Each structure stands twice: as C-alpha cells, then as structure tokens.
Amino acid sequence: MDINQTKEAVKKEEGYRLETYKCTEGHLTGGYGHKMLEGETAPTDHAGWLVLFERDFARAVTGADDLLMLCPNIKDTARNIVVEMVYQMGAFGVSKFKGMLKALQDEDYKLSLIHI
C-alpha cells in the first residue's frame, strides 16, 4: 500500500462531516476527524476541510517518521499502519506503544501486531 492509499484509507475510516460534532472524547471535531484547535474556525465547505486534512495527514506522516527513525528498513505496510495510528492518536499517543516500536525496530512484524 502506498502513502496515497493510506491517505484514502484514513479518509474512509474517519468518515466525513461538514458540520462539527463532539467526538467520543468530547472534542469538537469535523471534516475527516480533524480536532478543532482553540481559536480555529471550522471550514464551511469540503474544500476547506480538505486543506485541514492534508495538513493533519502531513503531520501524521512526519510524526510516524520521527517515531520510526530507528527503523530504516521498515516495510511500507508497517509504516503506513503507524501513519494511520498517528493520525488518530497523535505521535505522543503512539509513542506509548513501546513494545510495538521495539518490534518494528527489530523487524519483527508479527510481534509488533501483538503490541498494538
């Protein structure tokens, strides 16, 4: 799976909402799972939400790559799973999956799945 397929998978999993809503954690959310930040104005159309999605997705890729710095040979599929996780939980949240990250560093993909 390439990164564009991952991007589309994230969109599908998150779903799309034009109007903001409270997510299960109580945060004001909209578009493709974008958590509204303090002082941020919600877009009024799909194009505006896409801009936020692209920014959020780029941050997820950067966050995943930072977490995977010690995994230079990681398979694309595993990297893309970490990108999806970072999109949903943030890099800090995913950093708590220490067993998974260590298994990825060791290229033990089966063990990494156990730690998710």
PLM feature segments, named:
Residues 1-8, 62, 66, 110:
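Extracellular cell-wall/glycan-interacting regions and their flexible linkers
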Residues 40-71, 76-97:
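Alpha-helical segment that forms one wall of the substrate-binding/catalytic cleft
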Residues 93-111:
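Short secondary-structure subsegments characteristic of cysteine-rich extracellular domains
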Residues 114-116:
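Conserved small/polar residues in nucleotide/adenosyl-binding loops
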Residues 22-42:
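Substrate-binding/active-site groove segments that recognize
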Residues 17-24, 73:
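Catalytic glycan-binding domains that act on GlcNAc-containing polysaccharides
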Residues 6-15, 81-86:
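Short, functionally critical alpha-helical segments immediately adjacent to catalytic or ligand/cofactor-binding
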